[in-house]
Amino acid sequence: MSLVLENVTYRYSQGTAYEITALNHVNLSIGDGEFIGIIGHTGSGKSTLVQHLNGLLKATEGAIYFNGENIYQEKYDLRGLRTQVGMVFQYPEHQLFEATVLEDVCFGPKNQGLSKEEQQERAREALK
């Protein structure tokens, strides 16, 4: 599975007096099986970039391809994309709030709409 960003630009509040360019012609290629880390100062665009990787934000300009398909094409399966493109937060203790580790690990499968049984089965497998 590959993820390619081509000349991705993103502007907050485009067309207003408050317009801010957060990403400016970003090009990035993440190959099959690769893991990446993104570092930078506060306000440098890290979170904005990451939100583009699974289609949470739509680029103002440019394109994003997952396995060769443009994720911005009409009727693209964004839900399917989000089941395959994952993120790990820098400070997970600020992101997860469940009473047990198992319930925290169920977070991803739960958001995929899986049954409680399937969530727990996948979480237990991941924790082995």
Q: Language-model segments: which ranges?
A:
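A short, flexible loop at the N-terminus of ABC-type nucleotide-binding domains that lies
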Residues: 1-2, 11-25, 74-77, 116
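The feature captures the beta-strand-to-loop junction immediately N-terminal to the Walker
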Residues: 39-41
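Helix-to-loop junction immediately C-terminal to a conserved catalytic motif
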Residues: 54
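Conserved ABC transporter NBD signature motif
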Residues: 62-73, 81
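Short coil-to-helix segment of the ABC ATPase nucleotide-binding domain corresponding to the Q-loop/switch region
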Residues: 98-106
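Conserved ABC ATPase "signature" region
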Residues: 117-128
